[in-house]
């Protein structure tokens, strides 16, 4: 059981993969589930000024990367996937959908509710995932961003993406599916890894909805506004960052 805030779902997947690689397990059910919409949680996140107050238009309140974003919208749900070694999958007659090629995690302990503005901690996590997968940042075709729709958090992730991709940032479709689902906290990594897997499997990039005016500080990025898009995806990155400074990156690839 992983208890690492909003990165917990991705870390559960990463830990499951490590157990399989070490021989401790052949197959694992991994991801996250969360039922968090309750008075205590709402009061706590409200006190932290983390929640959107756009109550007049709740359907559009979750708006990552938008200049008018003002906090996240809490969501509930679950996302689980079965991971296993290729040998085990073949032995039971299963057809692999995608390959888990890279995973990395880090902690920066910068602040209880936000990462460092230079994205350093998250960058370390993604670089660890790239190293595990023997990939370079230039090989990533899509990013499912953590982007929760908070003013500070989205900017920190943008810094991470600039660190990783440099001048190539505009060539990589970056989606925040939290614009549609809200923020599922500990389940976020589970459900977003499934979005990422489907992007790899189907060569379709999910959109970032509610993005009407892109933040000027994020000029040059392609956030796939409004509508899904056909796009070849060989390797995709899924990010998950949690309160307290925990970071995780997961890379899913077409089956080789």
Question: What does each model-identified segment do?
Answer:
Residues 95-99, 135-141, 171-173, 206-209:
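Flexible, glycine/charged-enriched surface loops at secondary-structure junctions
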Residues 24-70, 103-117, 145-154, 171-221:
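Acyl-CoA/ACP chain-elongation machinery
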Residues 56-133, 142:
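Condensing-enzyme catalytic core mediating Claisen C-C bond formation in acyl metabolism
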Residues 12, 125-133, 164, 196, ...:
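Stable alpha-helical structural segments in soluble proteins, enriched in small hydrophobic residues
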Residues 9, 16, 45, 82, ...:
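Conserved small-residue
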Residues 154-171:
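Glycine- and aromatic-enriched membrane alpha-helices
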Residues 3-34, 73-94, 183-205, 250-252:
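Active-site-proximal alpha-helical scaffold in enzymes
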Residues 133-139, 170, 219-256:
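Flexible, low-complexity linker/loop segments at domain and module junctions
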């Amino acid at each position: 059981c992983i208890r690492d805030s909003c990165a917990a779902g991705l870390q559960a997947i990463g830990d499951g993969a490590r157990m399989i690689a070490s021989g401790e397990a052949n197959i694992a059910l991994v991801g996250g589930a969360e039922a968090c919409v309750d008075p205590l949680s709402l009061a706590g996140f409200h006190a932290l000024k983390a929640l959107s107050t756009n109550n007049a238009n709740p359907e559009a309140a979750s708006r990552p990367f938008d200049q008018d974003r003002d906090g996240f919208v809490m969501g509930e749900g679950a996302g689980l996937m079965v991971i296993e070694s290729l040998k085990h999958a073949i032995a039971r007659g299963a057809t692999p959908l995608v390959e888990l090629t890279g995973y990395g995690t880090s902690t920066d302990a910068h602040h209880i509710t936000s990462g460092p503005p230079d994205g350093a901690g998250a960058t370390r996590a993604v670089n660890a995932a790239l190293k595990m997968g023997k990939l370079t940042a230039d090989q990533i075709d899509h990013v499912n961003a953590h982007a929760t729709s908070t003013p500070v958090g989205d900017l920190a992730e943008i810094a991470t993406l600039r660190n990783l991709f440099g001048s190539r940032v505009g060539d990589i479709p970056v989606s925040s599916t939290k614009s549609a689902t809200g923020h599922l906290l500990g389940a976020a990594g589970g459900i977003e890894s499934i979005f990422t897997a489907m992007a790899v499997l189907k060569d379709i990039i999910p959109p970032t909805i509610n993005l009407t005016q892109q933040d000027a500080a994020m000029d040059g990025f392609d956030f796939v506004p409004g509508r899904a898009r056909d796009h070849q995806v060989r390797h995709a990155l899924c990010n998950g960052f949690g309160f307290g400074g925990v970071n995780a990156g997961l890379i899913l690839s077409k089956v080789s």
